[in-house]
Amino acid sequence: MAKGRHRRIESRRRRVTKRALVSGSVVLVILSTVMVVAYKKLEGNINTVSTEALGDRPTAVKVEGPKAPLNVLVMGSDTRDGANGKGIGGSTPGLSDTTMLLHLSADRSRAYGVSLPRDAMVNRPTCPSKSKSGPVPGGLTMWNSAYAVGGPLCTVKTFESLTNIRVDHFVVVDFVGFRSMVNALGGVKICVPEPVDDDIGHIKLPAGTYKVNGQQALDYVRVRHGIGAPTGDIGRMKRQQAFIAAMIQKVMSAGTLANPARLFSFLDAATKSLTTDEAFADLKQLA
């Protein structure tokens, strides 16, 4: 009888183990399917632009190893009309008021950013027009006009002609999308070191620490008036860099990474706001 009981127990164990393996396999298949669908959706959100029109470019630096460091030119597109211009008045023809070169290390563990002043006077090369109406003659002009006349390709071409540094990829972030990204995270905590009282941008903040929503964040990173030194575009660049660092910290926090719904909502908002070169639209490039 003992042997029979033992065989029955072993039989039940095998059935339980088999059911657990089958259930685990089903869950794994479902999770894999969800991940593939989510990946495809995020990748499909991104708009792309071909870089063929750039013509002659600086030579890419060759490095040993499976991965190379990347230079990514990040532009913030600000038309300031419609939903993008809420609360600021006026409109612009689509300037890039924010431009930053990000250098990603080969192992992708570090990133270094350098902001480019939008009001800097530069010699812009001849560029294909954004409206595809023919080439736009170059000349001495403000940095952010390159985006207005020729979009991201003219901005890349201008940067490369000035620095002889090859831009491996570019990313354009729409400011409306920026607002959605912050809201998807449930807000971002920032430190305001001195009072902000900007009648043009309609933003007033005493000095202190705040958790800002998307619209408040957008107003804050746009501010160029009504704030103590450093003022103007240089001060704004520093605030933008500090805010981006705070947003990245929120994305990488346990509260976001351990919350699949919040993480996907952020990634969905982020990818919907992006325009990149065709190669960079493959999300695996960031891995």
Protein language model regions, located:
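Non-catalytic, solvent-exposed segments at the cell envelope interface
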Residues: 2-287
